[in-house]
Amino acid sequence: MELSLVVPCYNEEGNVRLFYDEVRRVFKNKVTDYEFVFINDGSTDATLDNLKSIYNESKYRDNVQVVSLSRNFGKDSAIYAGLSYAVGDCVCIVDADLQQRPEVVLEMLEILHNNPDTDCVAAYQEERREGKAASAMKSGFYKIINKIAEIDFVNGASDFRLMRRNMVDAVLEMTEYHRFSKGILSWVGFNTEYIPYTVEERASGESKWGFGKLFRYALEGIVSFSTFPLKLSTFVGLFSFVVSILYLIVVVCEKLFKGIDVPGYATIVVLVLLLGGLQLLCLGILGEYLSKIYIQSKNRPIYIIKEHLGKK
């Protein structure tokens, strides 16, 4: 098998058929040895029924797999499940909403074929079709995480990428429960070439990624690939100590040389609130890391398969 398309699906009933037909149209006479690996990530609409219909109607059932998870485990877990079931020499992660065009996949394939030393071709968003505020926040996230993380993140890069089998196998060895795919795909290394692409409008439906979900995902990435927040607690403590010493010196000098008594009640209230807030912040950061360790120590599966159609 030359190519596997890993397609995570969550409530994409209006898109999966359009995606399937469009890929077949674009790939016709250009790519023949390929498969679809659809991952139903606990959808609550008719996504699974539509995927079963695609599988049952396909004249070439050998090139369609439908993997249905027992509940919604999240896109990153669905991607891991898809990579586990993909059998192609090259594997491409692509969304079902047609915002990532099949023509770009052909471009990626051509680059891999012409460059044997390249292990991965990843796409980054050349143009963001979103509000200025959202675009600024995403750019800010990449600037922050690149300063504090142990690996580099390309601004605008997504999970949309084509990988050779050796890289896919390396990603599958990363069995952490809390998954941040952008970081994992960068952490494993390998020679990666980045190409620009334009995000198209969704073929159907609305995006599942609101501000709150994006914020939690960004926090997940920072905690997963940086220990800087833990070190920040040390810096905050040291800064508070230095400020306290300086303030003490000021109070003593004013008392000895000017005879001025500093009002005690207001000072105490401010210091208690300040130090209490800093302590809670540091405890919250520590708790975030401890919670990840706690969940990982349970050794729970990353995903659970409820149903599988097709041949692996």
Task: Describe the residue ranges of each PLM region.
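Structured catalytic core of nucleotide-sugar glycosyltransferases
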Residues: M1-K132
